[in-house]
C-alpha cells in the first residue's frame, strides 16, 4: 500500500510533471507527499592566479543559489496545494548530491515511492553523464517512478 510519496523537483517542466503524477497517485491512495528540492553547491574553480572565476563574492553566489532553490520549492508546494488541496503536502530543501539526498531522504522517511522527472538528456550525454533519475532508480530500495 502506498502511504508516503517523495517527489523531487528542480524547476524543470519534467519535474513539475512528476509532481502532478505524484499528486494524482497520492489522491488515489490517500497518501502524503513530501516535495524535495536539492541544493548542490557547485565547485567554484580558481584560475592559476587564484582568482575566482565567479565575479561576485562566494557568499553572495551561495545566497542567490539558495534563494532560487527556495523559490522553486515554494512554487512547487503552492502548485501542489492548489491542484490537490485534499492531499497532505510538505516541502523540504536539502543540500548535497541530488540522487544521494533523494535516496537517503526516502530511506530515512520510510517512503513507499519516489517520483522523479526524466531529464531528457541526449543519448550520448546519458551514456557519459547518466542522470539523477537513473541514479535514484539504481540506488533506491523502494519503488521509483520516472515521469517523462
Language model features with spans:
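Short, hinge-like loop/turn segments at secondary-structure boundaries
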Residues: 50-54, 107-109, 132-133
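Conserved N-terminal glycine/acidic-rich loop preference
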Residues: 19, 51-52, 68-73, 98, ...
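Glycine-rich, Arg-bearing micro-motifs that act as flexible, cationic patches
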Residues: 113-135
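General small-molecule cofactor/ligand-binding pocket signal
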Residues: 36, 90-94, 145
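A short acidic, glycine-rich active-site loop
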Residues: 55-71
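Small/aliphatic-rich secondary-structure junction motif
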Residues: 3-56, 84, 88
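Structural beta-alpha unit
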Residues: 75-114
